[in-house]
Amino acid sequence: MIGEQKTPRETSAPAASATASPALPDAWAHTPLTVVMPTYNEAGNLPGMVELLMGLELPGLRLLVVDDSSPDGTGQIAEDLAEGHLAEDGTPRMSVLHRTTKDGLGRAYAAGMAKAVEDGAAYVLQMDADGSHPSAKIAEMLGVAMSTGAGLVVGSRYVPGGTLSDAWGAHRKLLSRWANAYASTILGTRVRDITGGFNMWSAEALRAIDLASVGSAGYSFQVEMKFKALRRDFQVMEVPIHFEDRTVGESKMNLAVQLESIAMPWKLRARARR
């Protein structure tokens, strides 16, 4: 039943500056963490994103780009960038998963996250390639995950301290808040940013969820994954972030994705009641 969810385990980390990047204990900084970054026509954004991530004081961080055969050459750009980023032991800090079928953001994430866990990541971070998610918050999110034992840490736009880009108009901001309230109300959760895509998962949580069982192809993947984590009693923490608008390229949101996002919470609720 929906009411059986462990809502007390949905909590927020103390509010902090959206640009904060606290130093981690050395052992924590070396924790195997893989950033999974789906791409489609992100040639203009990817080089800058790679430099930001590789410049973080997180020796354990690896980047897995999941490219859906981008016609603008993003996949080859990713391969070229990977050659220039090696760990101290000579192993690559960046790799590329090439997919031949463009069948949705959710499926790209699922493929990348499964590979990351298979390759030994202790934590997996979902991150957009368009610069909307703040790389400066990754260390803080990892620290929260490791200090609390949370299965999921959400980079949240809607907890105290979280903010949205000024480039978003009032209509877009209202629509985003409505989408969060819509999904959370139907599913009976108190996660403030259930639709957000900047999420850090423990490998344990991902194995328990079983990525192959996730049915969402598009953006509703974010909602389905969080709901499944709560159903399995994993603690969910939320850390405030500032969400930027992309400056290069176009959004991949389309009508089919929007319709799936409307229908998916009802499907998840119906399955939970069986």
Regions found by a protein language model. Give the residues of each.
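Hydrophobic helical membrane-anchoring modules
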Residues: 1-32, 55, 188, 212-274
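Short, acidic, metal-binding catalytic loop of nucleotide-sugar glycosyltransferases
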Residues: 51-60
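Acidic helix N-cap motif at the loop->helix transition within catalytic regions
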Residues: 44-48, 72-81
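Active-site beta-to-alpha loop of glycosyltransferases that engages the nucleotide-sugar donor
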Residues: 37-51, 69
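Acceptor/aglycone-binding surface of glycosyltransferases and processive sugar-polymer synthases
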Residues: 93-94, 99-118, 123, 135-219, ...
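A conserved acidic beta->alpha catalytic loop
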Residues: 67-76, 131
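Short beta-strand/loop segment that forms part of the nucleotide-sugar
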Residues: 37, 60-70, 97-98
